[in-house]
C-alpha cells in the first residue's frame, strides 16, 4: 500500500538550500548518483566474498540512460538494493549515509566504499523537479518499492514492479537544467567524473560511421577503465603503459619527460602517477592539470592545498581516501594528513630528479630546459625542496655547457672575484641582444651564464641570499671594468665645463621616449676601449623584471627604463667631439660664459648678505636682485644650451655614436634605425 511521509530534516527550507548551494557546479549530481550506484555494487561484491550473499551476482555494471522526450536521466545498478525499511532509514534521514554504517561493519574489507559524504543522493534535486527511486533488496523475499519526492519535504513510498535486485534512480529534469538531457553533455560528464570508477559504467552503444552518418552498433559503450595504471604495481607496467595512460589523460599534450608512481599505505593512503611535462615559459598555462580522485572517483583538478604550489605544474593523478572533503567534494580542507601527503609528494619528486641527475646526467641535462622553470618555482616557494634542488640545479653558460652550483663556482672564482672578495656571476638575458656585452666579458676571460627564464630574476635574488659571498650582475649593467671591480675606478680628466658641455651635446641627440630615461655618464676606459656604450643599472632593472610576477612590486614596473649612456673620455672620438665643439661653438659662448661667471659671483655676494638674517630682515632690494640674478642666469644658460643643441643636431658624429650604442644594446628600431642606415651611407 502507498505511504506518505515527511523527510527527516530540521527545516522545510533544506531543499532550496540543497538545490542552490550544496555544490558549486550542478553537474556534480551525475558523479554523486553514479558513485552511489557503484557503492551499492561494491557492497554486493563484499557481501558475496564474506558469504552473506550466495546468489548469482551476474553482470555487475551501472547503466546510465537519457530520455529526452520523457525528460529523464536514469542511473541503474544491480547492487544490494534497499528494503522499505532501509529506504526509510537512509533516504528519508538526510545527513546519514548507509555507506558510513557499512564501512564501520566491514572496515577491514578491501572493498572501496566511496559514498561517505552523507548528502550525495540529494544532489539529484539540483537539476530535477522530481526524483523516483525504484529499488529491490538482494535479501530473500524482498519486495520492490518506489520512493518519490518533488523537492519538498513530503514524499510517497509505495510497492513497485521490479524483477531484479538493485536500484533505478529516475531524475525528472526541470526546465532550468534542460542541457543535461543532451546525450553529448551526459557522455562528457561521465568521461570527466566517472572515467576510472571501479564498476563498468555503460552509456548506450558504441557508434560507427555507416551510410553517411553515425549509427549505433551492438557493442555497449563502456565509459570507464576500471583498472587504471595508478592502481597497478609499478613492476607490472612498462614505459609504454605509462605513456599510454598519459595520452588518455592529456590527448593533446606532448610526451612527458618522465614520471613518478606513488604507492603509500602508511601512515596515510596515497596512490597515483605524477608526470613531468615539458614546461614552457609560462606558469599560468601549466596549472590545474593534476586530477584528484577518492577511490577512483574524480573530485577536482584544483589541488592547491594538497600539493605545494609548485607541484601544480605537474600532470597526472593523485588518489587518496585520506584527503578530507567538505559536503561538495569540491573544496579541500587542511589537516595533518594533507600536510604529510604534501611533504611526501615533494620528497618523492626531489628523489626522482636527484636519481636521474646522479644516474643519467646526460639525459638530465638534455631535459633541463624543460625542467628548469618547475625546479626554480619549487626552490622559490619551498625551503625543503630548495635544499634538495641545490644538488642538481644547473647553470647554463653561453656555449650551452651546464654546471652545478659547486662546479660553476670552481670555474669562475679564480678570475671573477672582485676586490672585496665577492665572486661575481655574470649573466645575460638575451643571447643575441646583449651579444656585444657578452663578447667584451668573454674577451676578458670571464664566463657568462644565460638566465632568460620567467623566474630567473627571482632566482638571482634568492641565490645571492643563499650562496656565500656571491653577487649576480647582468653583463650589460656596467662597463666591463666595473662589472667585476678589481681596483678603484680610473680618474676622468675633464673640467666641469667640459663635462657639462658633453652632457648637453649628447642629451640633445638622445631619443625622446617617456618609457626610457637616459643619463650621460663618464668613464676612463682607455683609448682602446669603446667610445660609447649603454648600460642599465642592475638593481632597478632586476626590480622591474621581478615586478612582472609580483603585484606588490608594481611600483617598479611602472617606472621608465633607466639607462646610462657612458662616454669613454679616453677615446679619440669623444675627444674629437669635444674639440669640434671648442672650435665651432666655444668662441661664440665666451661672452655668455663670462656673463654666467659674473652672475654667479653676484649671487654669492647676495647670499652673503642674507647670512644670519631672518627672511623678514632681508631688504626687499636684495630679494629682487636675487630674483633678477636667477632669471638672468637661466636666460644665459638657455642661450648656451640653444647653441650647443643646434651644434649637436647638425653634428653627424654625435648622432652616429649614440646610434651605434643604441644598436649594440638592441634599442635602435623603426625610423631611428632607418635614419642610422641613411647617415652611415652618407658618411661612407
Swiss-Prot record:
Segments for region (A): 1-329
Region (B): 330-548
Stretches for region C: 549-684
Keywords noted in UniProt: ATP-binding, Chaperone, Cytoplasm, Nucleotide-binding, Stress response
UniProt keyword annotation of Phosphoprotein present: no
InterPro entries: HATPase_C_sf, Heat_shock_protein_90_CS, Hsp90_fam, Hsp90_N, Ribosomal_Su5_D2-typ_SF
Subunit structure: Homodimer.
Similarity comment: family membership: Belongs to the heat shock protein 90 family.
Protein name: Chaperone protein HtpG
Native species: Porphyromonas gingivalis (strain ATCC BAA-308 / W83)
Amino acid at each position: 500500500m502507498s505511504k506518505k511521509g515527511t523527510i527527516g530534516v530540521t527545516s522545510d527550507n533544506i531543499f532550496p538550500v540543497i538545490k542552490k548551494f550544496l555544490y558549486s557546479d550542478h553537474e556534480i549530481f551525475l558523479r554523486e548518483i553514479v558513485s552511489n550506484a557503484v557503492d551499492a555494487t561494491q557492497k554486493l561484491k563484499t557481501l558475496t566474498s564474506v558469504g552473506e550473499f550466495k546468489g548469482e551476482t551476474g553482470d555487475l555494471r551501472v547503466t546510465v540512460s537519457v530520455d529526452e522526450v520523457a525528460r529523464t536521466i536514469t542511473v541503474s545498478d544491480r547492487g544490494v538494493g534497499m528494503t522499505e525499511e532501509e529506504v526509510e532509514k537512509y533516504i528519508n534521514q538526510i545527513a546519514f549515509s548507509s555507506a558510513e554504517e557499512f564501512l564501520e561493519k566491514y572496515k577491514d574489507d578491501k572493498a572501496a566504499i566511496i559514498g561517505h559524504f552523507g548528502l550525495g543522493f540529494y544532489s539529484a534535486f539540483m537539476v530535477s523537479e522530481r526524483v523516483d527511486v525504484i529499488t529491490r533488496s538482494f535479501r530473500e523475499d524482498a519486495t520492490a518499492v518506489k520512493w518519490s519526492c518533488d523537492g519538498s519535504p513530503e514524499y510517497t513510498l509505495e510497492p513497485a514492479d521490479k524483477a531484479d535486485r538493485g536500484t533505478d534512480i529516475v531524475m525528472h529534469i526541470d526546465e532550468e537544467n534542460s542541457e543535461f538531457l543532451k546525450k553529448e553533455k551526459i557522455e562528457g560528464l561521465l568521461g570527466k567524473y566517472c572515467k576510472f570508477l571501479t564498476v563498468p559504467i555503460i552509456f548506450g552503444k558504441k557508434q560507427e560511421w555507416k551510410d553517411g552518418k553515425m549509427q549505433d552498433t551492438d557493442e555497449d559503450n563502456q565509459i570507464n577503465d576500471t583498472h587504471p595504471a595508478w592502481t597497478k604495481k609499478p613492476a607490472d607496467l612498462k614505459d609504454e603503459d605509462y605513456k599510454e595512460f598519459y595520452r588518455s589523460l592529456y590527448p593533446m599534450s606532448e610526451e612527458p619527460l618522465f614520471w613518478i608512481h606513488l604507492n603509500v599505505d602508511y601512515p596515510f593512503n596515497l596512490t597515483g602517477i605524477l608526470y613531468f611535462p615539458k614546461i614552457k615559459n609560462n606558469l599560468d598555462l601549466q596549472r590545474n592539470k593534476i586530477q584528484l580522485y577518492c577511490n577512483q572517483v574524480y573530485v577536482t583538478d584544483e589541488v592547491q592545498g594538497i600539493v605545494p604550489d609548485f607541484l601544480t605544474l605537474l600532470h597526472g593523478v593523485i588518489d587518496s581516501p585520506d584527503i578530507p572533503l567538505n559536503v561538495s567534494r569540491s573544496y579541500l580542507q587542511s589537516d595533518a594528513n594533507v600536510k604529510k601527503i604534501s611533504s611526501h609528494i615533494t620528497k618523492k619528486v626531489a628523489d626522482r630528479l636527484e636519481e636521474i641527475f646522479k644516474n643519467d646526467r646526460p639525459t638530465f641535462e638534455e631535459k633541463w630546459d624543460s625542467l628548469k622553470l618547475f625546479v626554480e618555482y619549487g626552490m622559490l616557494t619551498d625551503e625543503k625542496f630548495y635544499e634538495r634542488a641545490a644538488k642538481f640545479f644547473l647553470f647554463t653558460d653561453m656555449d650551452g655547457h651546464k654546471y652545478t652550483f659547486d662546479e660553476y663556482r670552481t670555474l669562475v672564482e679564480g678570475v671573477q672575484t672582485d676586490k672585496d672578495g665577492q665572486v661575481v656571476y655574470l649573466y645575460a638575458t638575451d643571447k643575441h641582444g646583449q651579444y656585444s656585452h657578452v663578447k667584451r666579458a668573454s674577451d676578458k676571460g670571464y664566463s657568462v651564464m644565460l638566465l632568460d627564464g620567467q623566474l630567473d630574476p627571482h632566482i638571482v635574488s634568492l641565490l645571492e641570499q643563499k650562496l656565500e659571498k656571491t653577487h649576480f650582475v647582468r653583463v650589460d649593467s656596467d662597463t666591463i671594468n666595473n662589472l667585476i671591480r678589481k681596483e678603484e675606478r680610473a680618474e676622468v680628466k675633464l673640467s666641469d665645463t667640459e663635462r657639462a658641455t658633453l652632457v648637453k651635446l649628447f642629451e640633445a641627440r638622445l631619443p625622446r621616449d617617456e618609457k626610457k630615461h637616459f643619463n650621460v655618464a663618464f668613464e676612463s676606459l682607455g683609448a682602446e676601449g669603446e667610445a660609447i656604450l649603454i648600460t642599465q643599472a642592475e638593481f632597478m632593472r632586476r626590480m622591474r623584471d621581478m615586478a612582472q610576477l609580483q603585484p606588490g612590486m608594481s611600483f617598479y614596473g611602472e617606472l621608465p627604463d633607466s639607462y646610462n649612456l657612458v662616454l669613454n673620455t679616453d677615446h679619440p672620438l669623444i675627444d674629437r667631439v669635444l674639440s669640434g665643439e671648442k672650435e665651432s661653438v666655444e668662441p661664440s659662448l665666451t661672452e655668455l660664459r663670462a656673463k654666467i661667471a659674473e652672475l654667479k659671483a653676484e649671487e654669492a655676494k647676495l647670499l652673503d648678505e642674507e647670512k644670519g638674517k631672518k627672511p623678514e630682515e632681508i631688504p626687499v632690494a636684495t630679494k629682487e636682485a636675487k630674483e633678477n640674478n636667477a632669471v638672468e642666469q637661466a636666460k644665459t644658460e638657455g642661450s648656451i644650451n640653444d647653441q650647443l643643441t643646434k651644434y649637436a643636431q647638425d653634428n653627424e658624429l654625435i648622432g652616429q655614436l649614440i646610434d651605434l650604442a643604441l644598436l649594440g644594446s638592441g634599442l635602435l628600431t623603426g625610423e631611428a634605425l632607418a635614419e642610422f642606415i641613411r647617415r652611415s651611407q652618407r658618411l661612407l
